[in-house]
């Protein structure tokens, strides 16, 4: 009888230990997921100016495009290492009816850099020389024109003393330019991700949690 009671008590203790372990592992996993979760940088077009499209006759032969792109790090405690940031500037091919093909007019590369947590990086640049004939073909009857800016890079997140693997970031946005060659929208234009951009928030934390659970399981 005593042996049966001891077996029952031992079984209860074992169940209690298992439940306690599962609860602790779950809380630890949740804490790590919240701590290691990384948000991708948010990019926007703040300035965009093509002098050749302005009203000044002396600027007709100007073959430059001036811009400023801003990248915001929304993470409170994670820095971001950027590889070279590649920018492609395009316009819509208006020589064909119902055509939406993009015609590249220039490109620019921002050298790799580091961005601290909750910091904003303003990257000014000038693209030259532009093909003014291609640029002028983009002008609509009302004097405005629409261009496309695509951004592509890879980033790594700095978490305490270590860095994550690289994650691809591909975003872009259309920019309307008025009759003065200046970005028509006064506020910054948010650049949205393309379909090929890596889903950072889902894959990175999940992989960490899976490794953690395997570690606990084999102990």
Curated annotation (Swiss-Prot):
* Covalent lipid adducts (GPI-anchor amidated aspartate), residues: 195
According to its UniProt record, where is this protein mainly located? Answer: membrane
Q: Give the recorded effect for residue 2 to A.
A: No effect on the interaction with RIN4
What are the entry keywords?
Cell membrane, Glycoprotein, GPI-anchor, Hypersensitive response, Immunity, Innate immunity, Lipoprotein, Membrane, Plant defense, Proteoglycan, Signal
- Consequences of knocking out this gene: No visible phenotype under normal growth condition. In case of infection, plants loose R gene resistance mediated by RPM1, RPS2, RPS5. Plants overexpressing NDR1 show enhanced resistance against the virulent strain of the bacterial pathogen Pst DC3000.
Span-the-membrane segments of this chain are none
Can you give the propeptide residue ranges? 196-219
Q: Which domain of life is it from?
A: Eukaryota
How is it modified post-translationally?
N-glycosylated.
Q: Name one GO biological process term.
A: defense response to other organism
Provide the residues annotated with a glycan attachment (glycosylation). Answer: 62, 88, 93, 98, 107, 132, 142
State the signal peptide span: 1-38
Please tell me, according to the UniProt entry, what happens when changing residue 8 to A.
No effect on the interaction with RIN4
Subunit architecture: Interacts with RIN4 (via C-terminus).
Give the bilayer topology.
Lipid-anchor; GPI-anchor
Recorded name of the encoding gene:
NDR1
Please report the organism this UniProt entry assigns to the protein: Arabidopsis thaliana (Mouse-ear cress)
Q: Tell me what effect the entry lists for residue 7 to A.
A: No effect on the interaction with RIN4
User: What does the annotation give as the result of altering residue 3 to A?
Assistant: No effect on the interaction with RIN4
Question: What is this protein's name?
Answer: Protein NDR1
Q: Which GO terms describe its cellular component?
A: membrane; plasma membrane; side of membrane
Q: What is the lineage of its organism?
A: Eukaryota, Viridiplantae, Streptophyta, Embryophyta, Tracheophyta
Outcome after substituting residue 5 to A? Loss of interaction with RIN4
Localization recorded for this chain is: Cell membrane
InterPro entries on file: NDR1-like (IPR044839)
Q: What does this protein do?
A: Involved in disease resistance. Required for resistance conferred by multiple R genes recognizing different bacterial and oomycete pathogen isolates like avirulent P.syringae or H.parasitica (downy mildew). Required for the establishment of hypersensitive response (HR) and systemic acquired resistance (SAR) after infection with the bacterial pathogen P.syringae DC3000 carrying avrRpt2. Required for resistance to the soilborne fungus V.longisporum. Interaction with RIN4 is required for the activation of the R gene RPS2 and RPS2-mediated resistance.
| Effect after changing residue 6 to A | No effect on the interaction with RIN4
